[in-house]
A protein has these predicted regions:
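Membrane-interface micro-motifs in multi-pass membrane enzymes
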Residues: 28-32, 73-81, 135-138, 199-210, ...
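Alpha-helical transmembrane segments of multi-pass inner-membrane proteins
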Residues: 2-22, 37-44, 112-124, 141-146, ...
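Aromatic-anchored transmembrane helix interface
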Residues: 78-83, 107-119, 129-152, 171
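A membrane-periplasm/extracellular boundary helix in multi-pass inner-membrane enzymes
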Residues: 4-6, 26, 182, 242, ...
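Long extracytoplasmic/lumenal interhelical loops at the membrane interface
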Residues: 187-192, 317-332, 336, 340, ...
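Membrane helix-loop boundary segments at the extracytoplasmic
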Residues: 59, 64-70, 381-388, 421-461
Length: 476
């Protein structure tokens, strides 16, 4: 798919990267490890195609390890490879704009570009510009890799399957590693959040990624595929399910329940408009009866940490479940921040460094912090609202909403069985993340970001491949 001349240009970019890495190592010997991914890329390009490098990144992302230098860090080996591919994308976009023209015309791409532009604007006005521009750069290389390169590479639908197999097999390594560590501590629930380190930060992102891969893999088992492909997806599904169960993550368990209910509605041919209307009605009722709902929740004293059923019951316990109380503390602190800067927000990536001053002592818990070292807003929706204002929030809603609408349309009106299979698998997988995003946010971490942006790239490529592309989404 990629011409020899383009590969030669990537060689040049890679060699330049190698020289820059060597210069960095010469000045700062402790950063020697930075040279390794560039070497891997150059050697790989002499043996493989760009498509295979793409799959290597997918495979290595789940078990990549963060290497810190100063106040910054890179996940190795995947992020340096994504940076090189981002540079190549810029070169190709300038030299061969027609290659990406169909992708750039897609509605999902339009919303995504608006989102990136708004992140740039709010980085300029940020309360911590350096933090925000680091956030923007990391977002750019994951979006470029997963979405733009993905949309191009996934034009061959077989590459969707290859990508998910590569990522899933990489995730199996993490699950086996985590399960072995967990076994060593007697499968303790308290230790569950630590056993995947240093491959993943904690059990929340681990469970979110496992849920996404599980939903995709199980869907693939119910469609026609080659025997060995089904065996691979069966093994990946088994590993992912093990990861979800042993993570003791309430959000992950609920996200899988949610997609099961959604699948039933999908089989009943629910329209996208009906779905949006239903969600709108729920939100309105939530506002009208918020006091009654709060009083009901206030009576819940179910504690987490005993078993999965108890964990799920404890989700609405805002009295003595420390995790829930701390989440409310962060959300209320964030809401005070939003009221102060509703339009532009505090800047992308700044919440964890700024929210401490907006906490109230009576709402803080033993796990609260005032040092900006204990995570973010715990919501994929609330975070952008605080950091990029109301416009940033709406753009995230539009991006997620458009992807659901397109996938539902593809599922209801597929050009062939494979389109139906992939659209359903991607839809259910993304929905686990969108639901999980109500309580956590991971798009600033490569483990989830690569998977989410790649799946959105799959959405665009499937939509471009659809023969009846002019068919209106209003039919959904």
């Amino acid at each position: 798919m990629v011409a020899n001349a383009d590969v030669k240009k990537l060689y040049g970019i890679s060699i330049l990267g190698l020289l820059l890495s060597a210069f960095t190592v010469y000045l700062f010997p402790s950063y020697f490890i930075l040279i390794l991914p560039t070497l891997v890329l150059i050697v790989g390009l002499f043996l493989l195609s760009i498509e295979n490098i793409f799959l290597i990144v997918a495979f290595s992302t789940p078990f990549s390890i963060k290497y810190l230098f100063g106040n910054s860090g890179l996940n190795l080996p995947d992020e340096p490879l994504m940076i090189v591919l981002m540079l190549l994308f810029i070169v190709k976009l300038i030299e061969k704009p027609p290659l990406f023209k169909p992708i750039l015309k897609e509605s999902l791409t339009f919303v995504l570009i608006l989102n990136l532009i708004w992140i740039l604007l709010t980085s300029i006005t940020s309360s911590l510009p350096i933090v925000s521009f680091k956030f923007l750069l990391a977002r750019l290389w994951t979006v470029t890799f997963g979405y733009f390169w993905g949309a191009l590479i996934f034009k061959n639908p077989k590459n969707i399957k290859k990508f998910m197999l590569a990522f899933g097999l990489g995730l199996c390594i993490v699950v086996i590693y985590s399960t072995y560590n967990h076994y060593g501590v007697g499968f303790s629930q308290k230790k569950a959040m630590l056993v995947m380190k240093p491959l993943m930060d904690d059990h929340t992102v681990y469970s979110a990624v496992c849920s996404m891969v599980l939903a995709f893999s199980i869907t693939m088992l119910f469609f026609k595929n080659r025997f060995y492909t089904k065996i691979l997806f069966y093994g990946i599904a088994l590993c992912s399910l093990t990861g979800v169960i042993l993570s003791y993550s309430r959000a992950a368990a609920l996200s899988l329940v949610f997609v099961t209910i959604f699948l039933i509605l999908l089989k009943l041919k629910i329209r996208f408009r009906t779905l949006v209307s239903f969600i709108g009605v729920l939100i309105i009722f939530g506002f009208i009866f918020n006091n009654e709902i709060y009083q009901r929740i206030r009576l819940n004293n179910s504690a987490s940490g005993k078993n999965l059923v108890g964990d799920i019951k404890s989700i609405s316990n805002v009295n003595n479940d420390e995790s829930n109380v701390e989440r409310l503390n962060r959300w209320e602190s964030g809401f005070r921040m939003f009221k102060e800067k509703p339009l532009l927000g505090f800047g992308p990536g700044t919440y964890q460094f700024q929210y401490s001053g907006y906490q109230k002592s009576q709402q803080m818990t033993s796990i609260s912090t005032t040092h900006g070292d204990m995570g973010n807003a715990h919501s994929e929706y609330f975070g952008p609202l605080i950091e990029s204002g109301i416009v940033g929030f709406l753009l995230v809603i539009l991006l997620f909403g458009f992807s659901i609408a397109i996938l539902m349309n593809l599922y209801y009106h597929p050009k062939d069985e494979k389109t139906k299979m992939y659209s359903l698998a991607i839809l259910l997988s993304l929905l686990t993340y969108y639901f999980h995003g109500l309580m956590n946010d991971f798009l600033d971490q490569d483990k989830a970001a690569v998977l989410v942006w790649a799946m959105l790239g799959m959405v665009t490529s499937l939509n471009l491949n659809q023969s009846n592309i002019s068919e209106s989404l209003e039919k959904v």
